[in-house]
Regions:
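Beta-propeller blade termini
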Residues: 38-47, 90-99, 118, 139-148, ...
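Beta-strand-rich domains and repeat architectures in extracellular enzymes and scaffolds
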Residues: 30-43, 47, 53-55
Length: 284
């Protein structure tokens, strides 16, 4: 443990001395030391043209999620609880699910139903409905218009339970889910893009628990391609054109294994691999 602390301290000191960009400020503190924060998201939720912050708290233990409002100068002196209940939340992405011009919130919860909160346009969020199953271990949400109807849909990543696609009914409601993949896929994150250039969005799943990562191809999401090793224990995935060849590549971040970039080719394959970072960490 001492070695890890020293490494982190040296790394932080080096970054600070070289750039001197990041400084702590009392008004920049979000939440308390007791908060079990899983993730944050940022967007202008109250329409005043600055970025506000949504904090997802709890993980496995129910806590209150929070909205922190920007004062226009990058400080967050005012906050509000999201909803009346504490939840076991992992992620709260924001998007305009009903196309009324403001950002709504989608809450991903562990071992309880996920939630939709709709914005009244002024940053007040009213609970609208639940979606998903009560026993699902939701870890992440991918928000994207899969069926090209102009409304965002929700792809739900559930750890060791069925993953689902929830299509928007054009009114911001998500009722019946479409299952895809294995029933016990241990998915943590999902990213989406048209990887094989056929006009349909595909889904890349970051899996843990000794499971391979997978690519599921649209529009039906039955056909899949295995990506990486079952020893990767992947925690995150991103998609971008890393080598500027006009073809999308896939980046995975792993625990106990090297992080990887999988370079795509014109046939939609990802055979060329470049690893980055080292495991185990060097001892200083």
């Amino acid at each position: 443990m001492k070695k890890i602390i020293i490494i982190v301290f040296i790394l932080f000191s080096s970054i600070y001395s070289q750039n001197n960009l990041f400084k702590s400020h009392p008004y920049g503190t979000l939440g308390t030391a007791e908060s079990l924060t899983a993730s944050t998201s940022a967007g202008d939720v109250d329409g005043d043209k600055d970025l506000d912050i949504i904090v997802a708290n709890g993980r496995h233990w129910a806590q209150q999620n929070q909205i922190f409002f920007n004062d226009g100068k990058g400080f967050f002196r005012r906050s509000r609880s999201l909803g009346k209940e504490a939840n076991t939340t992992y992620q709260i992405p924001m998007t305009d699910i009903d196309n009324d011009g403001d950002l709504d919130l989608i809450v991903a919860n562990d071992r309880t139903e996920n939630q939709i909160f709709k914005n009244d346009g002024n940053g007040n969020f009213i609970f609208d409905h639940y979606f998903g199953k009560n026993e699902s271990n939701t870890r992440g949400l991918c928000i994207i218009d899969l069926n090209k109807d102009g409304y965002d849909d929700i792809v739900v990543a559930n750890r060791k339970s069925q993953n689902y696609i929830y299509y928007n009914n054009s009114k911001g409601h998500f009722s019946k889910g479409q299952p895809f993949g294995n029933h016990d896929e241990a998915t943590i994150k999902i990213a989406s893009a048209d990887l094989n250039q056929d006009g349909y969005l595909d889904l890349v799943l970051a899996n843990r628990n000794s499971q391979h990562n997978r690519i599921y191809y649209g529009p039906d999401y039955n056909k899949f391609l295995i990506l990486g090793s079952d020893e990767d224990e992947t925690r995150g995935v991103a998609i971008n054109d890393m080598n500027s060849d006009g073809i999308l590549d896939i980046i995975t971040v792993n625990i106990g294994a090297k992080n990887n970039i999988y370079f795509g080719d014109k046939s939609g394959n990802f055979n060329k691999l470049q690893s980055f970072w080292k495991f185990p960490w060097p001892v200083l």
